[in-house]
Amino acid sequence: MITVAEYLDNWEKIRLSATSKLLDGLKHKFMFRNYVILTEKIEQLPYFDNFMSIGLPYVPNHCPKFAEYVSFFAKTSDIPSYVTHLYFDDEFNQPIKGCIPNSVTEVTFGNIFDQPIDGCIPNSVTKLVFGDRFNRHIKGYIPNSVTELVFGWSFDRYIYIDDYIPPSVIKLTLEKWDAYVEYIPTTIFDLSIRGDIFGTIPLSITHLTYDCWLRFTKFTIPRSVTHLVFGPNFNYDVKNWIPDSVTHLTFGERYNQKIKNSIPKSVTHLTFGRYFSRSVNRVPSSVLVIKLSKTYNHPIKDHLASKIIRY
């Protein structure tokens, strides 16, 4: 019964155990894996320790014994020692020296945070996200445990950024870029970038997400890229630009250009945004999956019908 129950969600497990007195005791043996927001009622349950994924809207008296995912939305620097995923409020802009416990694996700062981080990020952190106003020195301050790193709108310390980012980082997001991409470390394989790109993107990049605003200048997309995503603001002609190494191609919600002869024959998975209203009847035969918005109402040829997925 315990093994079968692993295929059920939290609510289904509780309903199952409530069907008879014999099964009622299973509540103390079931592991509740689905994410829940902690309430006083949940905290008082005799099987509270069996909740494995919880969000804390307040600091409880204790944490579930078997919890593996504990998220906390912090408004102050008082962080419980058992939190694994830490999210700071957008209004938080206090010093953080000594406030992030070693249990934390992911840290996301709010939009106005702009404090020194020297010696503040523990070696347990693997994902580190800075908000829009952060623009501090980072050299030597990001631990080698970090594999995913995000910088916001205000960060402009790009010169020799390859000296600032540890080699452990493989996924990098730059919300505003205005420099030569040669500064991007070659250890990065997943790059998200928004702004003007100068120079040549490193051949280490296999996953590229690109977005721009008022102006757009084509740059060279290396043939190492297999997964290409255009952001929500991108709405430009891509004919003769996308390399034939790309297999997964995603356009953002505002993209609405003609695609005839614009999709390379290497593409197998194609996704269009919410406002796309052009014909898809001329996509290459290599395309196996086409994702379209539920509001898309352009006629689709019969031979493509089985490839369409609505979202």
Predicted feature descriptions by range:
Residues 15, 26, 41-47, 57-65, ...:
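Short, T/G/N/S-enriched strand-turn elements that build extracellular solenoid repeat scaffolds
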Residues 25-99, 103-110, 124-126, 130, ...:
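LRR N-terminal entry segment and analogous cap-like coil->beta motifs
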Residues 192, 204-207, 224-229, 245-250, ...:
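C-terminal capping region of solenoid repeat domains
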Residues 103, 124, 145, 168, ...:
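Extracellular beta-helix/beta-solenoid repeat scaffolds
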Residues 2, 11-30, 47:
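Short helix-loop-helix/strand-helix junction enriched in hydrophobic and basic residues
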